[in-house]
Amino acid sequence: MKKQLIIGTRSSPLALWQAEFTKAELSRHFPDLEITLKLVKTTGDVLLDSPLSKIGDMGLFTKDIEKFLIAKEIDLAVHSLKDVPTATPEGLIISAFTEREDTRDVIISKTGAKLLDLPKNAKVATSSLRRMSQLKSLRPDFEICDIRGNLNTRFKKFDEGEFDAMMLAYAGVYRLNFSDRISEILPHEIMLPAVGQGALGIETRVDDEQTREIVKVMNHSTTEYCCKAERALLRHLQGGCQIPIGAYASFKNGTLHLLAFVGSTDGTIGIRDEITKTGLTSPSQAEEAGIELAKELLKQGAEKILSEIRKSC
């Protein structure tokens, strides 16, 4: 058994929370293990002037950390799973999916108003095409404004800016103790989350069997089934672009239920569908369900939506 572990992480407050959480959990199970953090500045932390959709790189918040992992300068990387591309670099693997926090998105508004009660032509801040698409389908009058930076920076920009509301993931807001700022938690019926939202992905080298065995203690089986279904769906739909896709899977007693959404960036077209599979006994079966739903979405018109978006990539 290893005596030391180095965790690679971004340096944002939320990333540090995630890394410290991982460190604490591993220390609880392996009290004699010496665990340290290595902070890595990623491309996504540096390129803050452009919307994420315009940058186009799928590994903005992960690939720089993965370089350290491949070079054996760290033993594992802790990521927000929603930031992790569905294809990991050769030699790397997601070895643990941590128990998921609430997957829903939230609205933070200046007046405390809920989403549908915001004034006409309200300015809503988000950097996500997924949120933009679903917001515009609900309220075509909204003016969507790009907002970048870590969570603390976004709250500062929001408080100082001319926004009426801002949309964020509940998980990050809760973990950094901003829950008192929430105006509304949005149900999945109107806002499907990002693939993997609320879960952490712990990435290791494939050939590092000791570290893989250590981090297994953090793997949450239900989350693994759900996130593998969602990621398989995204992988089958994606073509290397930032695209408006939402998904949410639940898994209980061998039954997987998966909801998914693909929409145009302007919100004028949106396709939602779902699938239920019973008797599942392995995560690979959950992945098959994700691929099956992706194929159904493509048949229903998602291919046309995605091909239009890819033209501008």
From Swiss-Prot:
Sequence positions bearing S-(dipyrrolylmethanemethyl)cysteine: 241
Cofactor detail note: Binds 1 dipyrromethane group covalently.
Pfam families found in the cross-reference section: Porphobil_deam (PF01379), Porphobil_deamC (PF03900)
SUPFAM superfamilies in alphabetical order: Periplasmic binding protein-like II (SSF53850), Porphobilinogen deaminase (hydroxymethylbilane synthase), C-terminal domain (SSF54782)
Gene Ontology cellular-component annotations: cytoplasm
GO biological process terms on file: chlorophyll biosynthetic process; protoporphyrinogen IX biosynthetic process
Domain of life: Bacteria
Keywords: Chlorophyll biosynthesis, Porphyrin biosynthesis, Transferase
Needed co-factor(s): dipyrromethane
Gene3D superfamilies assigned to the protein according to its UniProt record, in alphabetical order: Periplasmic binding protein-like II (3.40.190.10), Porphobilinogen deaminase, C-terminal domain (3.30.160.40)
Gene Ontology MF: a single term: hydroxymethylbilane synthase activity
EC number: 2.5.1.61
Signal peptide region: none
Catalytic activity: 4 porphobilinogen + H2O = hydroxymethylbilane + 4 NH4(+)
InterPro entries named in the record: HemC, Porphobilin_deaminase_cofac_BS, Porphobilin_deaminase_N, Porphobilinogen_deaminase_C, Porphobilinogen_deaminase_C_sf
Pathway listed: Porphyrin-containing compound metabolism; protoporphyrin-IX biosynthesis; coproporphyrinogen-III from 5-aminolevulinate: step 2/4; Porphyrin-containing compound metabolism; chlorophyll biosynthesis
Miscellaneous field: The porphobilinogen subunits are added to the dipyrromethane group.
Function (record text): Tetrapolymerization of the monopyrrole PBG into the hydroxymethylbilane pre-uroporphyrinogen in several discrete steps.
Family that this chain belongs to: Belongs to the HMBS family.
Assembly: Monomer.
Protein name: Porphobilinogen deaminase
Species of the source: Chlorobium luteolum (strain DSM 273 / BCRC 81028 / 2530) (Pelodictyon luteolum)
Lineage summary: Bacteria, Pseudomonadati, Chlorobiota, Chlorobiia, Chlorobiales
